[in-house]
Curated annotation (Swiss-Prot):
GO terms for cellular component: plasma membrane-derived thylakoid membrane; proton-transporting ATP synthase complex. The gene is atpB1. GO terms for biological process: proton motive force-driven plasma membrane ATP synthesis. Keywords: ATP synthesis, CF(0), Hydrogen ion transport, Ion transport, Membrane, Thylakoid, Transmembrane, Transmembrane helix, Transport. F-type ATPases have 2 components, CF(1) - the catalytic core - and CF(0) - the membrane proton channel. CF(1) has five subunits: alpha(3), beta(3), gamma(1), delta(1), epsilon(1). CF(0) has four main subunits: a, b, b' and c. It is a multi-pass membrane protein. Belongs to the ATPase A chain family. Key component of the proton channel; it plays a direct role in the translocation of protons across the membrane. HAMAP family: ATP_synth_a_bact. GO terms for molecular function: proton-transporting ATP synthase activity, rotational mechanism. This is ATP synthase subunit a 1.
């Protein structure tokens, strides 16, 4: 039983290896790119709309609404980044319905990379919205003594974001595999559905936390400057 897709090696040459994490990450990206191209190539504003376009509009509007609820900010500027995170993690977890597939989210390297993207996005959005001086100033609030603690807080929440997603996906996959091996005649369908549900929930939790982290740096300064957006 493989706990993480990192341990499944398909090809190796010296220190370079091609493992399941890399293969299935590219598979998920390929599916998302092709799916996006197929759905958006014939978009229309006149009815009747295709079922795929209706489904896409529902998904985009739901993501936009969740961004507004979580951040109390206008959603459009965050939609490409937050939407991509959600769709990638969700698709990566939903494909576990296929027996040979291993979710890349079950690898700590994948979740660390996703958390690192959030870590970089936080100052980018913060500086873009409140300016570099106002953004950097929040690291010394309420006093300059808090600078190291605020920096540690930034790093620790990024680490927790990566470990939370990795731990939940890995533990769920392990639990499903154990139960299926114990009672293979009764639990496979139920446990597979349970794994899919947990995967979608974890994608939702990860993206909402990412949005909250991004909004937090902006809100701190907007409250000070009186430019808070409703």
């Amino acid at each position: 039983m493989d706990i993480t897709p990192d341990s499944i090696i398909y090809w190796q040459w010296q220190w370079i290896n091609l493992n399941a994490t890399i293969v299935f990450s590219w598979l998920v990206m390929l599916i998302l790119v092709l799916g996006s191209w197929l759905i958006t190539r014939n978009l229309s504003i006149e009815p009747p709309l295709s079922r795929w376009q209706v489904a896409l509009e529902i998904i985009v509007e739901q993501i936009r609404q969740q961004i507004r609820d979580a951040s109390q900010q206008k959603a459009d500027q965050f939609l490409p980044f937050i939407g991509t995170l959600f769709l990638f993690i969700t698709m990566a977890n939903l494909l576990t319905i296929f027996p040979v597939y291993q979710s890349p989210a079950g690898s700590l390297s994948t979740t660390a990379a996703l958390a690192l993207c959030v870590f970089v996005a936080v100052p980018i959005y913060g500086i873009k919205n409140v300016g570099i001086t106002n953004y950097l100033r929040h690291y010394i609030q309420p006093t300059p003594v808090m600078l190291p603690f605020n920096l540690i807080s930034e790093i620790s929440r990024t680490v927790s974001l990566a470990i939370r997603l990795f731990g939940n996906i890995m533990s769920t996959s392990l639990l499903v595999a154990i139960l299926i091996s114990i009672v293979p005649l009764f639990f496979p369908a139920v446990m597979t559905l349970f794994g899919l549900l947990v995967g979608v929930i974890q994608a939702y939790v990860f993206t909402i936390l990412a949005m909250v982290y991004i909004a937090s740096g902006m809100n701190l300064q907007q409250r000070k400057t009186g430019n808070h957006h409703a």
